[in-house]
C-alpha cells in the first residue's frame, strides 16, 4: 500500500482534483528550490509534496482573491521597506557630505 494513502490525503483537501493540483504545484516548488516544511521519507518531489499535504503543512488557500491580496500586500510592504532603506542611505550620504564640508 502506498503511503500516504489517498483516504488520508482526501481528508486534507476538498476533492481529488484539488489534491492533484496542489501536489503538482508543490512538487514544482520543491524542484525549483523551495524550502521544505519537514524532513522527508521520499526522494521524489511528487511524493514529498504528498507527505507535506498529509502532515497539513501545505494547504489550498480557501479564498484565492484573499491570497492574491496577501501577495500584493507583501510586495507593497517589501517595496516600502526598500524605499525606506534608500531614504536612510541618502540621508546618511547627505550627512557625511555636510560633515565633510564643515571640515574644509
Swiss-Prot record:
- What is the catalytic activity of this protein? RNA(n) + a ribonucleoside 5'-triphosphate = RNA(n+1) + diphosphate
Q: Name one GO cellular component term.
A: DNA-directed RNA polymerase complex
Q: Which domain of life is it from?
A: Bacteria
The Gene Ontology biological process annotation of the record reads: DNA-templated transcription
The protein's matches in InterPro entries, at most eight in alphabetical order, are given as: DNA-dir_RNA_pol_omega (IPR003716), Pol_omega/Rpo6/RPB6 (IPR006110), RPB6/omega-like_sf (IPR036161)
Question: What EC number(s) is this enzyme filed under?
Answer: 2.7.7.6
Pfam families named among the record's database cross-references: RNA_pol_Rpb6
Q: Name one GO molecular function term.
A: DNA binding
Family note: Belongs to the RNA polymerase subunit omega family.
| Assembly with partners or alone | The RNAP catalytic core consists of 2 alpha, 1 beta, 1 beta' and 1 omega subunit. When a sigma factor is associated with the core the holoenzyme is formed, which can initiate transcription.
Cited function: Promotes RNA polymerase assembly. Latches the N- and C-terminal regions of the beta' subunit thereby facilitating its interaction with the beta and alpha subunits.
- HAMAP family, from UniProt? RNApol_bact_RpoZ
Q: What is the protein named?
A: DNA-directed RNA polymerase subunit omega
Q: Its encoding gene is what?
A: rpoZ
Amino acid at each position: 500500500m502506498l503511503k500516504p494513502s489517498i483516504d488520508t490525503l482526501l481528508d486534507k483537501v476538498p476533492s481529488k482534483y484539488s489534491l492533484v493540483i496542489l501536489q503538482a504545484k508543490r512538487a514544482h516548488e520543491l524542484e525549483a528550490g523551495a524550502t521544505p516544511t519537514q524532513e522527508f521519507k521520499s526522494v521524489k518531489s511528487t511524493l514529498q509534496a504528498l507527505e507535506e499535504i498529509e502532515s497539513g503543512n501545505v494547504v489550498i488557500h480557501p479564498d484565492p482573491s484573499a491570497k492574491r491580496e496577501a501577495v500584493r500586500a507583501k510586495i507593497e510592504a517589501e517595496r516600502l521597506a526598500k524605499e525606506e532603506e534608500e531614504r536612510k542611505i541618502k540621508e546618511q550620504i547627505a550627512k557625511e557630505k555636510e560633515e565633510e564640508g564643515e571640515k574644509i
